[in-house]
């Protein structure tokens, strides 16, 4: 008996024995993911005249003394408006994944002396927020840009306080 067919059969069998790559524990989104076009959602005037901030604050139940994370803060539309609202006992954390946007926001906050707002750089699929820290986490005009939403939300959850919520 020739060893050639046996070796060929063994080669074919072992070729299929490579370890499969680990599948992601998170499913891919079943939707298109929008690119990050700009750190600015739209002109502030139309947002202000529509009462956007006031509506969000009311529906989210944001009160003085709360800790709020503004994820995907961009230029800080919400962050700068939340600072006086949360008052002396509250705090605001503005988070973004684009270093230049984060830096520009930090400079603007320093210039305006809004020391109530801290600025943090996050990752596309992990906002890198401290655990058990926030009463509300705002995801305003940015969720459609998240490439892996299940993973993002999984990483976001530990940062909520017991009765906290995502808006």
Q: Which residues fall in each region the model found?
A:
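A short SAM/SAH-binding and catalytic strip from SAM-dependent methyltransferases
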Residues: 135-149
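Class I SAM-dependent transferase core
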Residues: 18-69
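A short acidic, Gly/Pro-enriched loop at the edge of an enzyme's catalytic core
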Residues: 127-137
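Bacterial N-terminal signal peptides that target proteins for export
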Residues: 1-7
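A short glycine-rich, Lys/Arg-flanked "PGG" loop and its adjoining helix->strand segment in the class I
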Residues: 83-84, 150-165
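Class I SAM-dependent methyltransferase SAM/SAH-binding core
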Residues: 69, 74-127
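Short glycine-centered segments of the SAM/dcSAM-binding site in methyltransferase folds
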Residues: 67, 91, 163-166
């Amino acid at each position: 008996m020739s060893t050639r067919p046996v070796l060929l059969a063994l080669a074919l069998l072992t070729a299929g024995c490579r370890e499969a790559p680990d599948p992601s524990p998170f499913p891919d989104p079943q939707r298109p993911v929008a690119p990050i076009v700009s750190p600015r959602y739209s002109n502030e005037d139309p947002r202000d005249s529509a009462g956007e901030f006031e509506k969000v604050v009311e529906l989210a139940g944001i009160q003085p003394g709360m800790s709020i994370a503004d994820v995907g803060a961009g230029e800080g539309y919400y962050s700068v408006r939340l600072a006086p609202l949360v008052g002396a006992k509250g705090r605001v954390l503005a988070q973004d994944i684009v270093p230049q946007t984060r830096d520009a926001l930090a400079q603007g906050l320093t210039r305006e002396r809004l020391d109530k707002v801290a600025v943090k750089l996050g990752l596309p699929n992990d906002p890198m927020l401290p655990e058990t820290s926030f009463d509300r986490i705002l995801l305003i005009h940015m969720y459609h840009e998240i490439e892996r939403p299940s993973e993002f939300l999984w990483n976001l959850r530990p940062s909520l306080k017991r009765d906290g919520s995502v808006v």
